[in-house]
């Protein structure tokens, strides 16, 4: 998927709307809002767009009906019907550019946390795709642009009964070995610090708690009592 430099998909809709308004002012096209399209027909080289009150004829038609993601806004799936009636083959609509539900028990704990990360999708234990960017942890699972980018692959795989797994690397700029070295160096200066205090500045506190818990390191354990294995397990969780 491609985004404009603004990072907002709505910019595309705004650009199209402004161009339509410009052409309408020049009387080159007819502009109509809140008008339900009943049918799109092709007769020879001419397309006819029928509404309740009038019919528009043109040499080309763009079907941009918004799928069926928002019926309240008019996105009722009519575009699929129009496409079929015009002879197009329509594949089954599935969610895309969306968040992903996760089974992890601590997903609620991380709700609201944002973090740059690498998102790697595995389907039936085979690498499918990896994306980097800001990941947003939600009560249901994961969101954010890199998650949106992989979501369409998740939808197709689940439809076919395949197994999906997403790995998150919340510190993609470092290898596990480099992270171990960071923890060792911090240990020289932070011997009396405990728990999330040791990871201050590296990760949000909520995420630090989860990472330490998964590594089996007690939040009450001082850095001086960490073992080399603790550092290795924590680096692996990150």
Residue ranges and their predicted role:
Residues 71-91:
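Glycine-rich beta-alpha-beta "Rossmann" dinucleotide-binding loop(s) and their flanking helix/strand
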Residues 1-18, 70-74, 101-105, 223-230:
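Short beta-strand to alpha-helix junction loop
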Residues 32, 50-60, 130-133:
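Core beta-strand elements of the Rossmann-like FAD/NAD(P) dinucleotide-binding domain
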Residues 89-92, 99-222:
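An anion/pyrophosphate-binding glycine-rich loop and adjacent beta-alpha core
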Residues 12-23, 30-33:
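Active-site-proximal cofactor/substrate-binding loop regions of enzyme domains
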